[in-house]
Each structure stands twice: as C-alpha cells, then as structure tokens.
Amino acid sequence: MQYKVYGNQNQDVIILLHGGGLSWWNYREVAERLQNDFQIIIPILDGHAGSDKNFTTIKDNADEIISFIDMNFGGSVLLITGLSLGGQILLEMLSQRKNICRFAMVESAAVIPSKLIYTLIKPVFGRCYGLIQQKWFSKLQFRSLRMKPELFNDYYQDTCSMTKQNMIVFLQESSMYFIKKSLGNCVAEIHLYVGEQESKRMLFSARKLHETLGKSTLHILPTMHHGSFSMNNTDLYVKELCAIVKER
C-alpha cells in the first residue's frame, strides 16, 4: 500500500481513509490545513489510482493499515477518519483492534448488505465502463456526485486509470459490508456523520451504527449529500476534527 504523508513526524498522527473511486486528493485540502499541527497520513486504498496492488477485500485493506500502524506507531494513533468505503475499512479496523485509535470519524459508511446492488454491479459496469472513460460522461457522473468543480480533473484522471475489475470488486465488497459483533467492544471515541440528503440505506446505516456503538455521537448534517462534509466543506470538517481532539 502507498501512503501520502504531510506534516511533522514528531506530531500526533491522524490517518485519513478516502472514499471508493477517489484517491488521496479526497482529503488533500484537509491534510494541508492540518499539517502544521499533526502528522497526516493518507493511505491509497488498493485498486485505486496510485496504488500498488489490486483491490481484494475490505478486510485485507484494514489488515494492511493495521500492520502499518503497528510497524510505525506502536499499534495506535490519535485519530482515524474514513469516507464511504474508507469508513467501512475504518469500521473493520475498529472491529479487529478496539484501541487502534483514540478518536474515529466515520462518514457515510453503509452497513446494510444489499444482494440486489451486489448482483447489479457487474452487469452494469460491464456495459458502461467504456463510457466512464469518456470525458462528457464523466462530467455528468461528477455532477451527480455533487463534488466541488475544482476536483473534476483529479476525479476524471483517476477514474480513467482504474481497471474495470477493481471497480467491480470494491463496489461489490462495499455493497455487502455488515457490522461485526466485535465492533461493540471498541474503546475509541466514535463520531458518525451522514448527510441529511443521502439515501435511506445510508441514513439507516448511520442509525444502526449509532445503536451498536452506544457511546458514539451521531451527526445528521443538514442539506448535505454523500461525501459533502469532507470534500466540499473543508473549513467545517477541520473545525469539527480539531474540536474532537482538543482534549487529547
């Protein structure tokens, strides 16, 4: 696994796990804002642009990041955040290692498995993968994701560099992710975020996570869509993160 690193090695460590189909630039602005006060590490998830291997499973990605933390930071870091697929990987890490971090920010992580979505992914992407690499189609898709315009070039370039197989595998993995019983043993302070305008499945996932993690805090973000918090509202996101860790 490849990593982008910002900040000073002597500072507390924050790890940012990007969303599926994106890459390290998902958190670029956040990392730039925080680098004077923390060491920021952004793993490039397997199968994504800039990675060094194909995507296999959410568990494999979680295992690799846990090993990285063990090797470099003594088994625990200050805070880990994750968006969507990155949020699922974070939940998997917390399920395996209850004290992998002191604080966690989980944004829009689906935990309601859907066999229908799983079944549809392969035939749909089999037919439209060629379109995804067309700039006009990519612009339409980008607008539907409601990301801020300045991220389009990164999005288009990285979407074109992803293989069809990697897209299919990570989407299928994400569609079937579910809460592990061991997640309830987690001792990290967990903050859950979901946009008010997200799908019913995503809103239900956030509430189910909140029920499972009795001491967690659930934030339903007014007017926001999927990924809007970390990608489109950097100032608010950084303010929230700093407020969480200020008592460290």
Walk through the language-model features, giving the residues of each.
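Flexible "cap/lid" loop of the alpha/beta hydrolase fold
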Residues: 95, 101-131
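Gly/Ala-rich beta-loop-alpha elbow adjacent to hydrolase catalytic centers
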Residues: 82-86, 90
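Active-site loop/oxyanion-hole signature of alpha/beta-hydrolase fold enzymes
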Residues: 41-81
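Conserved alpha/beta-hydrolase "acid-adjacent" motif
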Residues: 199-205
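Conserved HGGG/HGGXW glycine-rich cap/lid loop of the alpha/beta-hydrolase fold
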Residues: 4-50
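Catalytic histidine-centered segment of alpha/beta-hydrolase-like enzymes
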Residues: 224-236
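Conserved alpha/beta-hydrolase catalytic His-Asp/Glu region
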Residues: 116-117, 131-184
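Short beta-strand/loop motif that positions the catalytic acidic residue
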Residues: 186, 192-194
